[in-house]
Regions:
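Early extracytoplasmic/domain-onset interaction patches
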Residues: 19-52
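Short, solvent-exposed beta-strand/turn "edge" segments of beta-rich domains on protein surfaces
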Residues: 16-18, 30-39, 108-114, 195-198
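Mature, soluble, non-transmembrane domains
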Residues: 94-210
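N-terminal signal peptide c-region/cleavage motif recognized by signal peptidases
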Residues: 11-14
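Structured domain cores in non-transmembrane regions
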Residues: 49-129
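Short solvent-exposed loop/turn micro-motifs enriched in small/polar/acidic residues
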Residues: 22-23, 83-84, 200
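Sec-dependent signal peptide recognition
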Residues: 1-8
Length: 210
């Protein structure tokens, strides 16, 4: 599975503290012609160490160059694994929780210069919804995975949204540890997803429409 704790540690991830995987992301909120929002279109770029771990054992036709076809089985495994984590996406429309359908249009590509994988996928909402207020948060409740918006002007955009809709994107705060204290693996091993500890590092998207 894509977020296999034991496998990542065996591959050399630090056992001293979370997180173990870093994801830099961009995305689009997709709207239908009637002004309802239908889902989120993502591009998640994994750190180079995780990318190396994930591609171990793959045999591309050209060494070091992975095509979408080479990565197709891995892409499928990735999106299947993400289901167990709720796709790390928590959305509400007009104050009510939105359920997700399974991802569509998913694929992986590989940047040979930076040696990183990027997972592209569309995450549809179970039903389109006309939302005066839409809030989406992306984070890992257990903070095994660190998510952050790409360092660009507009990491999130609206596609097909009514012109009067206003988008606000908020980046997560940095983790600060008081002097003399450490948040090692023992601390995180006590956590479960229900503790929702990682919510304090949520990447937040807010859209308000008249």
């Amino acid at each position: 599975m894509i977020f296999d704790v034991a496998g990542l540690l065996a591959a050399g991830a630090s056992a001293s503290a979370h997180p173990h995987v870093w994801v830099t992301m961009q995305g689009e909120l997709v709207y239908a012609a009637d002004g309802s929002v239908t889902g989120v279109r993502y591009a998640w770029t994994f750190d180079d160490m995780f990318s190396a771990f994930a591609t171990q054992g793959l045999e591309p036709k050209k060494p070091g160059v992975f095509t979408r076809q080479d990565l197709e089985p891995l892409a499928k495994e990735n999106v299947n694994s993400l289901k167990d984590f709720g796709y790390f996406t928590f959305a509400k429309a007009n104050g009510s929780k939105l359920e997700m359908k399974e991802p569509t249009d998913y694929y992986l590509d590989y940047n040979t210069k930076d040696t990183v994988l990027t997972l592209h996928f569309t995450l549809p909402f179970k039903a389109p919804v006309k939302a005066k207020e839409l809030n989406v948060e992306i984070y890992d409740p257990e903070y095994f995975v660190d998510f952050s918006f790409k360092d660009v002007k507009d990491p999130i955009s609206l596609v097909g949204a009514p012109a009067a809709c206003k988008l606000v994107v908020a980046r997560p705060k940095e983790l600060t540890v008081p002097p003399g204290q450490q948040l090692g693996e023992a601390f995180f091993n006590q956590l479960s997803s229900s503790d929702n500890w990682g919510a304090q590092f949520a990447n937040k998207i807010s859209v308000k429409c008249p």
